[in-house]
Amino acid sequence: MISGPILDARGLQAVAGLLERPIHAVDVGCREGVPERWRTLGAGATLVGFDADSDECARLNAAAISTQERYEPIALSDSEGTATLYLTADPQSASLYPPNLDAVRRHPELARHEPHGTVTVATTTLDRWAESAHAAPIDILKIDVQGAELNVLRGAQASLPAVRALELEVEFQPLYAGQPLFADVDIFLREHDFVLWRLRDLAHCGLTHSRRDERAFPVGDAVEKTRIGGQISWGNAIYVRAELGDPDSARPWQTSARDACVAAVLDLPELTLLALERAAAGTSGEPRRILARELQRARARANSRRLHGLFWEAPRHVRGFVGARARPRQAG
């Protein structure tokens, strides 16, 4: 049984090697480092992380195994200036918004949000940083800043037109006082020509009176049916540029090849196949040979995953080349 992205590390690096410039992936709120899956792009990517914790960035820079991976000790928001950073029991829960103490009281899982003081930090915007650093256009933007994701997006409006996909932590309940919620983020991104593609890692918080063994705090796409799920509280949202999911959208083969890498890194199999097919059809010579080879390999991996019921019923425009003999996933 095959698991993982349908375009593996070898395939990713082969396709990325055809691009006119490396994939540029940015992680805002990068404590503990950029996602490991980004590193599978190898020399085909430049990876930049941002975090307000200068000590953490120094540690990550010292541990980086490639000069194409670096960390900036910068707090990003929607303006230049200073802001209050609210510290919490768990350093990963620090935010530019104060913890919602009512939520902490109701949900024992949020004890990590207990206030532990404040510090003043300098802030800037992603757009201002990109301009001053002469940064390449951003292809993948990941934001996990504990309720301040919309602030970062508002400070990135000049950068967003180049972005092909975003991965954001979103809250469905106010875990921080005054924070924007999922609906606010969704409206903003739709206004900027992105569509919601997938929700992942949905976290549900139980109430104070729930028994410990009935409190669900899952990582994955669903709450186990045998458990009390509690209230949906937060998760990760994957957004893609609207044209990525449009089988009738025409774009240069270089753009489609870039989209294939982006979709594969985010483990979006149907978009990976669609982009590979478009890229292969749009070029000739050695690039076409490489793309056709990786498309064939990706189809085989997709077919195996579908046979084992791991992820999807192929959409209509992909179904014809995924494999006519594959059985649809059984309900149940």
Residue ranges, per PLM feature:
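Phosphate/nucleotide-binding beta-alpha loop and adjacent structural elements of enzyme active sites
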Residues: 1-332
